[in-house]
């Protein structure tokens, strides 16, 4: 896997909740290219819980939204914003696990 360099890192005003490394409350995602896939391994943190030992659904949506945006950026060489997102959660994400692995493909 090859790490994707964040083109906005260090730019004035860049404070993305999903991927800005300097955002003190953000999730600070990093991304890698693995063939056709964009991958992120995000380390779970108890301060993002919605319920005891359960990752908040809004944070799960952020992780999904962010990796999709990076797939668009990397594979289509353009940026965009989410206009609609519908999510059905199949099972809870346990915050006592070490990490969650996200993978996106166009």
Could you tell me what each predicted segment is?
Residues 67-106:
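Hydrophobic beta-strand-centered segment that forms part of the acyl-chain substrate-binding groove
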Residues 39-66:
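A conserved, well-ordered hydrophobic junction motif at loop->secondary-structure transitions
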């Amino acid at each position: 896997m090859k790490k994707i360099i964040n083109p906005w890192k260090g730019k004035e005003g860049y404070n993305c909740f999903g991927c800005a490394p300097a955002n003190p409350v953000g999730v600070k995602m990093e991304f890698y290219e693995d063939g056709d896939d964009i991958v992120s391994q995000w380390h779970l943190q108890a301060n993002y819980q919605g319920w005891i030992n359960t990752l908040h659904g809004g944070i799960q949506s952020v992780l999904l939204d962010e990796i999709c945006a990076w797939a668009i950026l990397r594979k289509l060489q353009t940026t965009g914003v989410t206009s609609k997102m519908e999510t059905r959660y199949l099972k809870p994400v346990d915050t006592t696990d070490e990490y969650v692995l996200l993978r996106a493909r166009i």
